[in-house]
Amino acid sequence: MTPDEARENTITYGILRSHDVDGSKGKKMRIRFDAMMSHDITYVGIIQTARASGLEEFPLPYAMTNCHNSLCAVGGTINEDDHVFGLSAAKKYGGIYVPANQAVIHQYAREMMVKCGNMILGSDSHTRYGSLGNMGVGEGGGELVKQLLKNTWDINAPEVVLVWLEGKPKKGVGPHDVAISLVKATFESGVVKNKVLEFAGPGVKELPIDFRNGIDIMTTETTCLSSIWITDEEVKHHYDIHERPQDFKELKPGDVAYYDMMIRIDLSSQEAMIALPFHPSNAVTIHELQADPVGILTRIEEDAKKRFGDKVDVHLVDKVVDGKVYADQGIIAGCSGGTYDNLAEAGAILKGKSIGNDYFTASAYPQSTPVSMAVTREGITADLIEAGVVMKPAFCGPCFGAGDVPSNNGLSIRHTTRNFPNREGSKPGQGQLSLVALMDARSIAATAANGGVITAATDVEYENTHKPYVYDEKIYKCRVYNGYGRPRPETELRYGPNIKDWPTMYAMQENMLLELAAVIHDPVTTTDELIPSGETSSYRSNPLKLSEFALSRRVPEYVGLSKEIQKQDLARRAGEVSANIAEALAKVGAKAEDTSFGSCVFANRPGDGSAREQAASCQKVLGGDANVCYEYATKRYRSNCINWGIVPFTIAKDVEFNFEPGDKLFVPGIREAILAGKEEIDAQIIARDGVKPIHLFFQNLTADERQILADGCLMNYYKNKK
């Protein structure tokens, strides 16, 4: 048996092949999903794009949750206007609508949408349900539009990584500890990028479902493509208590299965972890931090000063008092943190204790109303409230900057998914900087019980005597609208004044003249830097208004530069060629009528983090035509660029890119090259000190993706097909 044949015996390939419409078992896959998920930052844009492309009804179960800006009082009525639009769309097209604060997106999927052997596509990067036997994939809105129009998700057949679990976690160790260690071991090297993680081994049976879910949801931070786990009696129990026993089936690899690599995790030796600013991979054990707090926090301070310069004043080392590190805030929330088991453990640790009445504060967000009901009935809520923890509804806010923003220079410890720069909501342009460290709920509770002194839960005594989770679906039956299979086309969509159509986007011309509007040399550029989240996301349904925030926390000049470039291009299209364009084209011998003029972003490795398509669409709305980088951090960001007509150029790793905003890039014959199937092209940099050659790559584009780029964006592509 060859490796390729044996790879077909993995759980991963069993699921992927059953969803591949080609059925050829080749190196390319064209996937149709079983269901889809979106939240209120993304579903309006997806539906607007799909409507413009010919949508008639939802052809698969599509659940829309309202868990992101539901507590964010920004812009008057605009948040609830989007929610009302979502319900009207669910009625019109046959969707599933989950009202505000009923559940965070991924918990609703776990409770109501997953099935063993199925695949779910979500417009959120943390779409991961592998621990329940359901492969989840997070992509930008364009990929969901394709599914709504009965098209496919096209990928190269991925490599598969075996994650072998052994041993049993010690008391006080939680899922975030294991997950942070996994991210630390894999992110920087990119060793599992765009691969599927398949979890197996004797350690799996030692982990309850909430523990598995907590690890699984964080696999996104490794930059893997998706995940899947073996299923067992614990998974069967999950489906049984959720009244869906028919959706369980045993998943395991064949007798001989080939994996491209293996990661071995000894759960017994896992320590309590802390992921320091500004990435989940920037991790040490809590004991290591306790041993050298000044040295470690000094390095974080230096990193912050390098990132933000004199825009902010950082004093992280001030958190060390008498050799102990003091946090200002503790948060347990979202799809990773707000589980029943995490809250039960936190409640047990804090029972009879107090978080104190000093600067330290704590909040907990059960991840769904059924979980909230369960922790209330079991007395966990009472234990937490009596200790001083504020209980809040199901809401993703602390995970992306729309809830519990810390004070300036505040150190927040969080059981959430990310701690990227400013993701918690601080605004460096206004001199603000908060710092977030990721920890497991157990150690956050131990820290809270110790007055904010960062403490490992493995170092405290406690007994968790709470009963196992009991699920109650009554609330969903009362509140969730499920119209799948029953569209009501006569329903009028309800538009608030902030919900706007997409502006005109132009087809690619024969040549492309680009002006650099942002040049970023950070090792990684996150989607939160490309378009901030938090309160900014309230403007998600107004493309022009949202684009005003593009790169605002990283390159404040970007929007102004891009608008000026776009203004000149619109004038060129009307026959008025600016001196800026004319001078540049004269140096390369090109004509203005054949050459578009657009903005361009250079970054070393852009696109880590969120699947939000706005990271690309905002560039396009501002006249962006291309990105240039050494590599894209994630497939989903690159796909977002393509779907919005932004050419995803790369350059060779040994090429220095020492150019500045205002320098230009001329790409002759780009339209012909893309449509002819070429993968590289010679271009020219028009810099302040002369014209220089540069070689650009645009590899691994499908025929459809090439046409999307030529047409200018996905919407134009579908319009042209009608």
Feature roles, as predicted:
Residues 1-722:
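Fe-S-dependent hydro-lyases/dehydratases of central metabolism
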